[in-house]
């Protein structure tokens, strides 16, 4: 598996960056997709990029606690201003993909494995 920065993945996929440009140089070591917060808590690994449709404050808290590289929100979902402010404070880049989770995960997988 190749390692890319969050910025490189965002550029290759045309993702919108909503916040935390300072975190865009983090290395992405893999990916994790889930909308169940307890699943992410138990199974996501440091340095992974988290793909989800959840856009509330707890997503940022878990991403920070698990030391994830970034959060990618699917289906063009945009979180509220308070979530963006918390992500900025925690140094967690929040990106937005227009497509559904299945398509987004497939593209990230292809980038990391080809």
Task: Identify the role of each PLM range.
Residues 31:
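The Walker A/P-loop phosphate-binding site
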Residues 25-26, 34-49, 53-114:
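Feature captures the catalytic cores and cofactor-binding loops of soluble hydro-lyases/lyases
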């Amino acid at each position: 598996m190749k390692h890319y920065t969050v910025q490189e993945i965002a550029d290759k996929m045309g993702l919108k960056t909503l916040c935390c440009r300072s975190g865009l140089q983090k290395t992405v070591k893999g990916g994790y997709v889930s909308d169940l917060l307890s699943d992410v808590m138990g199974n996501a690994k440091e340095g992974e990029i988290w793909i989800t449709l959840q856009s509330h404050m707890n997503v940022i808290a878990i991403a920070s606690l698990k030391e994830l590289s970034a959060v990618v929100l699917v289906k063009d979902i945009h979180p509220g201003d308070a979530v963006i402010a918390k992500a900025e404070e925690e140094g967690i880049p929040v990106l937005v993909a227009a497509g559904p989770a299945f398509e987004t995960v497939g593209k990230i997988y292809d980038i990391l494995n080809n």
